[in-house]
Amino acid sequence: MRITYKKSSIGYSQAQKDTVRSLGLRKLNQVVELPDTPVVRGMIFKIKHLVTVEEVTATEAK
């Protein structure tokens, strides 16, 4: 899964800020690629208003 940090977490709860950090996102427009697991999907669901998500196949992965 390719996750892009699109909106600042300023003004949101500390739990949501911690979730952004735990996904490895630090700066706006930063992109991380993470495995498609239930844990990662749960974290994305908590901050879905702050990020965009793309499904990435094995051949597209870096």
Curated annotation (Swiss-Prot):
Keywords from the named record: Ribonucleoprotein, Ribosomal protein
Q: Which InterPro entries does this chain map to?
A: Ribo_uL30_ferredoxin-like_sf, Ribosomal_uL30_bac-type, Ribosomal_uL30_CS, Ribosomal_uL30_ferredoxin-like
Gene3D superfamilies given for it?
Answer: Ribosomal protein L30, ferredoxin-like fold domain
Q: What is one process in the GO biological process aspect for this record?
A: translation
Q: Which CDD domains match?
A: Ribosomal_L30 (cd01658)
Return one GO MF term. structural constituent of ribosome
Q: Which PROSITE patterns match?
A: RIBOSOMAL_L30 (PS00634)
Gene Ontology terms: cellular component: cytosolic large ribosomal subunit
Q: How does it assemble?
A: Part of the 50S ribosomal subunit.
Family recorded in the similarity comment: Belongs to the universal ribosomal protein uL30 family.
Q: What name does the UniProt record give this protein?
A: Large ribosomal subunit protein uL30
